[in-house]
């Protein structure tokens, strides 16, 4: 019997082997107790402030919007220690693991940002760390692989399947099922079996709390829209959570359109998938006619995932959030544009969200509107990918 509701509407749940149920229930129990413990919160917020560098700024993009009446703000999670929003919830889960007397951490990573954040937390808090990463992602995110190893993490290549995030998730779960008495599985996104989607949201909601305070200070009113990229969905649910009850604020999640929805090479299960069971949860999932999982595709390793967190599936089902897609090319163009116009190198993941904000701006350039884009991470990890693509296509920077 769970202490918290394991579902968001019909989505969520605990679809795992029976051997993992005690571990999930133990995790839920300790999380519920920690949420009531003032010392736990003091430790968490002290780490966020004095180690990770919160609060992160809310930056107005004056050059990108020149000639329009749109104001676009970036929530600068790229400036957080570790280079992305991932550090928020990793610090929370790490001190939760210590509370449970678990001294080994297992994690999966796609873009490598969650892996880096996990390695950072484990180095800081003296925890053993092993990280599963698909071989395809290791090749396209090698700077982050080196960062993880520098901080003492063991990076385990996953050759199964497509060698991407979903395969790393499967291997990490398999490891945890054999070692959960001594280890904690630090899921990197707001997905997976209950209680992970709830835990990750609670540790990421600081993004939305800060954003609301900052936008009210700068504009004295709420924005027209909050826009964030969605793979598993942790950065998006983190910034959405504090605005869900503000019905006048549109919540827009941007999935990876890859090479184009019609090609089938994309990662947009919310709008182009079906309900299914994957990674211990019921959610939207890319499936073929036989119900087999289809491979996802994205220029961005962090969005290359065939499913999505259950809370996003629920928000989509009740029409509280809108989910759209942006292609690889649109994200690539926006990556370069932000660099040249504002001097900020965004992650390719975040470039999807900004690309959609610019689309909306260009649809109504004379309309007064305020958009907040969650710049979920920095793009240092992506510069080699972008360089190789531009070189291959013969384009000059």
UniProtKB/Swiss-Prot annotation:
Pathway: Amino-acid biosynthesis; L-tryptophan biosynthesis; L-tryptophan from chorismate: step 5/5. It catalyses: (1S,2R)-1-C-(indol-3-yl)glycerol 3-phosphate + L-serine = D-glyceraldehyde 3-phosphate + L-tryptophan + H2O. CDD domains: Trp-synth_B. It comes from Buchnera aphidicola subsp. Diuraphis noxia. One of its GO terms (molecular function) is tryptophan synthase activity. Its cofactor is pyridoxal 5'-phosphate. It comes from the Bacteria. Tetramer of two alpha and two beta chains. Its EC number is 4.2.1.20. It is an enzyme of class 4 (lyase). PROSITE patterns: TRP_SYNTHASE_BETA. GO terms for cellular component: cytoplasm. This is Tryptophan synthase beta chain. Belongs to the TrpB family. Keywords: Amino-acid biosynthesis, Aromatic amino acid biosynthesis, Lyase, Pyridoxal phosphate, Tryptophan biosynthesis.
């Amino acid at each position: 019997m769970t202490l918290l509701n394991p579902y968001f509407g019909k989505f969520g749940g605990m679809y795992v082997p029976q051997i993992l149920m005690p571990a999930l229930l133990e995790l839920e129990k300790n999380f519920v107790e920690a949420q009531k413990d003032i010392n736990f919160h003091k430790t968490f917020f002290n780490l966020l402030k004095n180690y990770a560098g919160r609060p992160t700024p809310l930056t107005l993009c004056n050059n990108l919007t020149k000639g329009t009446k749109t104001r676009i703000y970036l929530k600068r999670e790229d400036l957080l220690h570790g280079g992305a929003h991932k550090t928020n919830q990793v610090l929370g889960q790490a001190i939760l693991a210590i509370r449970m007397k678990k001294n080994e951490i297992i994690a999966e990573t796609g873009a490598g940002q969650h892996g880096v954040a996990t390695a950072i937390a484990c180095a800081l808090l003296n925890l053993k760390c092993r990280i599963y990463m698909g071989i395809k992602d290791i090749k396209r995110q090698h700077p982050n692989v080196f960062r993880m190893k520098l901080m003492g993490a063991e990076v385990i290549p996953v050759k199964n399947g497509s060698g991407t995030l979903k395969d790393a998730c499967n291997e990490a779960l398999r490891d945890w099922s054999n070692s959960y008495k001594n280890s904690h599985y630090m899921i990197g996104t707001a997905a997976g079996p209950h209680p992970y989607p709830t835990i990750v949201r609670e540790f990421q909601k600081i993004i939305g709390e800060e954003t609301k305070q900052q936008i009210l200070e700068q504009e004295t009113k709420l924005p027209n829209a909050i826009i964030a990229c969605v793979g598993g969905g942790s950065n998006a649910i983190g910034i959405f959570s504090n605005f869900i009850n503000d019905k006048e604020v549109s919540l827009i999640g941007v999935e990876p359109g890859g090479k184009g929805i019609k090609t089938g090479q994309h990662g947009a299960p919310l709008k182009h998938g079906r309900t299914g069971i994957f990674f211990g949860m019921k959610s939207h999932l890319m499936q073929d006619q036989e119900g087999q999982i289809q491979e996802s595709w994205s220029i961005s390793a962090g969005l290359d995932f065939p499913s999505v967190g259950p809370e996003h599936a629920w928000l989509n089902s009740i029409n509280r959030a809108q989910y759209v897609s942006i292609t690889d090319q649109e994200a690539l163009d926006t990556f370069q544009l932000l660099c040249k116009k504002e001097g900020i190198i965004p992650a390719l993941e975040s470039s999807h969200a900004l690309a959609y904000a610019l689309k909306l701006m260009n649809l109504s350039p004379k309309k007064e509107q305020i958009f907040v884009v969650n710049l979920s991470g920095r793009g240092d990890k992506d510069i080699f990918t972008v360089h190789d693509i531009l070189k291959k296509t013969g384009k000059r920077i």
